[in-house]
Amino acid sequence: GERGGPRWLAEGYEKPFYEGGAGKGNPDEDRLLDLRAEYEVDLIALARYMRILSPEVVFRYEGRIVNVHPSLLPAFPGAEAYRQAKDAGVRVAGVTAHYVTTDLDQGPVIAQRAFDVPEEVYHGDPIEDTETAVAALRQRGQPLEAEVLLAAIRMHLRDDVVVRRGRSRLRNGGEHQLG
């Protein structure tokens, strides 16, 4: 896989990698569970997955499913986070890697990255230029989505993340860039 990408990272740890597709709709949870039976699954990483996993899968893999979300959670959960950020007029936006729970985008945060919102996002006609503004936010955020997801995967695989009472902390917090 691409150097630095999730497949490359998994191969570096000699772990199998499965790509579940980028489409919307119901996830292929039967395939996911079949893979679990075939391999000793340490981690499920979701990137642009845009689907909601069933409680059965979430509970079975509690603390072992990492998602990347295009906002600084808890702000702007759910779909269209970049649009929500633009509509709210934020000056700082960002991305979050978090553990998946049955509550959408509410799981314990592992790492976040922030960026200044480009001033041009708020110039021009607010109705006509919305798509352009959202695209500008997405362009700034997407490279950070990959970065924060890979950082979270590394922290998880190194057993650096501890979750207690719905909150996460790092065993050696000073060793990681969290924001």
Spans of features found by a protein language model:
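One-carbon transfer enzymes
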Residues: 1-179
